[in-house]
Regions:
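N-terminal amphipathic alpha-helix/helix-capping segment at the start of soluble metabolic enzymes
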Residues: 1-21
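Short, well-ordered coil/turn segments that N-cap beta-strands
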Residues: 16-19, 41-45, 74-78, 98-100, ...
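Glycine-rich tight-turn/loop motif centered on a GG-T
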Residues: 18-19, 48-59, 99-117, 144-152
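Hydrophobic faces of well-ordered beta-strands that scaffold small-molecule active sites
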Residues: 20-24, 45-49, 78-84, 102-104, ...
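Active-site beta-loop-alpha junctions enriched in small/polar residues
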Residues: 25-28, 50-52, 83-87, 107-109, ...
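Active-site-adjacent beta->alpha loops and helix N-cap segments on the catalytic face
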Residues: 32, 56-63, 86-93, 107-130
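Active-site cofactor/substrate anionic-group-binding motifs, chiefly glycine-
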Residues: 40-95
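Conserved small/polar residues in nucleotide/adenosyl-binding loops
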Residues: 153-160
Length: 165
């Protein structure tokens, strides 16, 4: 079974009433461990790659590790996802490099700019059969290089969410 999209996975999970684990990976041992566990329980999985993992382990090596997991476990649905891609170029690189899902996280930008970047990623991704997740608001907490306080938190309202559903 080749890599699958998260759209396919989520549809089956919703219909079957189960959740799907998403695991950040950055080396062979992590990919092997997660893959072996998924095989044992016959569970689909999302293998995620962060900006930091791409810097640490190299994009090509990570893609090849996930391709090896697909070969070793042909019975397990596996999606390859970019976690918190900071810009269009990173998302494009992952789409062109074989990822089946990307997350654009331009939440550190002004809202209107975030929307435009997200729109550009969505158009490019959909032209290539890739699913997109987007962080349009900003939740309190720390993730990678971004720290958002409670007072800076921006949640996206219903009217905006309905435009993207």
């Amino acid at each position: 079974m080749p890599l699958v999209t998260t759209k396919e996975m989520f549809r089956k999970a919703y219909d079957g009433g189960y959740a799907i684990g998403a695991f950040n990976v950055n080396n062979m041992e992590i990919v092997q461990g997660i893959t072996e566990a998924a095989r044992e329980v016959r569970a689909p999985m999302i293998l995620q790659v962060s900006k930091g993992a791409r810097a640490y382990a190299n994009h090509t090596y990570l893609v090849k590790l996930v391709e090896a997991a697909v070969i070793e476990c042909p019975e397990i649905p596996i999606a390859l996802h970019l976690d918190h891609g900071p810009d269009f170029e990173t998302c494009k690189s992952c789409i062109d490099g074989g990822f089946t899902s990307v997350m654009i996280d331009a939440s550190s930008k002004p809202f209107a700019e975030n929307i435009e970047i997200t729109r550009k990623v969505v158009e490019y991704a959909h032209d290539h059969g890739v699913v997109v997740e987007a962080e349009l608001g900003a939740l309190a907490g720390i993730e990678d290089d971004v720290q958002v306080s409670r007072s800076e938190e921006r949640r996206v309202g219903k009217e905006c969410r309905s435009r993207w559903s």
